[in-house]
Amino acid sequence: MFRIFGPPGTGKTTTLLNMVDEQLQKGTNPNHIAFLAFTKKAANEAKERAAKRFNLDPDEDLCFFRTLHSLALSMTEIRTEQVMSGIHYQELSKKIGISLSKSPSLDAEIQDIQSNDHPILNTINLARLKKIDVRQLYNETYIEYDWNTVNYVHQCYKEYKLKNNLYDFTDMLQSFIDSADQCCPTFQVTFLDEAQDLSPLQWDIAHALDKKSKFMFAAGDDDQAIYRWAGADVEHFIALDGSSETLSQSFRVPRSIHAVAEQIVGRIKHRYPKRYQPKDENGSVKHIARIDDIDLSEGQWLIMAQAGYI
């Protein structure tokens, strides 16, 4: 698996699409190319850009331009009626005396599932995504339930699914991994975007795809990993075997912001060292004491909040 490290604004997705173009120029069938991302937004953007750029039908020609987890879910032999739904969670809730959230849709984002589930279900599924014991995760994080309650729900949840031959979202990912030799498609080349955000369980899917692909390229930036809370294993991306390259020119970050950003990333203890050049523009960095001091009525704004405060 060849890694492409892309600092902010260096064009990771564009670089991957240029490589898609090279494959198409060589005569590779579009359906023998997989372009996979962590979020639906990134996957859909790549699909739309590829359809327009290469004059392809997004549904017929680019069916493998999608999220990594949606590919895995679509390739299992689990039928729709076997998937845990709202009615199943309601029935289980009545049996155990604890109200649980209903099941997310199959095209939901993994990070949305982690933030919307009941805290106990969240803990159970996050432990599975991280491939660690539920007790270990419970000991490492805060949850407003005692261990006996968490363990009780965990055991009841497993028994309910087993008894009724039902699967949840994470079960379907595991099913793909367990049967990857049979259910994973074969590709000429696989492109993986946002690789820094994959959990250990998703990395198992990525490695299964690597085995079924003649070539595989994984693009990402460990400095931009924002989904550790959802199980992202950034260190796995950094430690992958194989060659790599770093995109060295940003087309987004001006000089003044680049200087501040470099000071901040220098505080990160475990990272892949990267050098890149800012775009030829000074830009500006301003320190604002209160958000009310900013006129948000014009232009586009990206506001980052820390610890839920804004």
Where is each model-derived feature located?
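Short, well-ordered alpha-helices that flank and scaffold nucleotide-derived cofactor binding pockets
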Residues: 18-25, 48-52, 174-181, 204-211
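Conserved helicase motor core of SF1/SF2 NTP-dependent helicases
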Residues: 7-13, 38-41, 196-282, 302-310
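P-loop NTPase Walker
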Residues: 1-81, 259-262
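Accessory N-terminal region flanking or inserted into the helicase ATPase core
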Residues: 1-10, 14-15, 32-34, 105-191, ...
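Conserved interdomain hinge at the start of the Helicase C-terminal
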Residues: 287-299
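A short helix-to-beta-strand connector/capping loop
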Residues: 56-63, 242-243, 280-286
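Short coil/turn segments at beta-strand junctions that form active-site/ligand-binding loops
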Residues: 31-32, 61, 185-189, 214, ...
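Short, polar/flexible loop-turn hinges at active-site or ligand-entry regions and domain interfaces
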Residues: 28-32, 53-61, 78-91, 98-104, ...
